[in-house]
Amino acid sequence: MAEQTRRDFLADVGRGMLVAGVGYGAARDLGLSTAWAADDVPDSLTFGDREPLVRLLQDTAADKLLPMLVAKWQSGTSLRELVAAAALANARTFGGEDYIGFHTMMALAPAYQMSRELPSEQSPLPVLKVLYRNSQRIQEHGGHKSEILHPVALTDATSKSSTADDLHQAVLGKNRDLAEQHFARIAQRSADEAFNDVLEVVQDNTEVHRVVMPYRAWDLLDIVGREHAHTMLRQSVRYCVKAECGNHNDYARGGSRLLPKLFDQFKLVGRPLGTKFAEDGWVEQLS
């Protein structure tokens, strides 16, 4: 694996946050997701073959967890699988609504990336650190019994033609259940469309967690699998609905009002991209 420079890493992060912040189209397919009719919705959200490992991470006390995870790794369970199970356990438990919980989710992909750049005998260390924090917070939250995410029951309040505007209006109206239904309808058609449409809601303001969350969920799809895109992106829908109920949201909404004015003022729509290279000295001066 080629060594990644600090500049390359920051460039990757910057590109991802720009996509999440201003709503540009997704660059690749994120897979499909599942929603349910109201009359056949199951009680619990489950994850197939990964469910036993997900439950282990939810139900095991943090002080007993690490020896079990090391034993699993030594017996052949990959770090990738451990991180995937942790991401799904985190999403199902917190649903993007717990401050420590979603910060832990955001740390999972970077921890896995760091593990791939370490010598084999040291590679589990960054992953184990975040998995410990993840399970510790899940236990503080109540474990498996306190899960936030459940299968979405679809009702006549939404239709297969739900749009980004429908989702947006439900979020602005602080109607979490309706927003979840619209988003599930959208995700049934295309996870790529779901990602783009949730970004239209995210870009309403520039609050940092709101911007970073869908980018980190996107990043984790390479680990958990694109079939879990709906589960991972639902966290942003719920976060945005919750944000509408707080005063901080009005403070952070200024960007959504200013950005269109700047685009018009400087005629940025359709303008050719510049070719000036950001020299190290210029970057240093700017920062």
What residue ranges belong to the model's regions?
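Mature, well-folded catalytic/scaffold domains that follow N-terminal targeting or propeptide regions
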Residues: 2-287
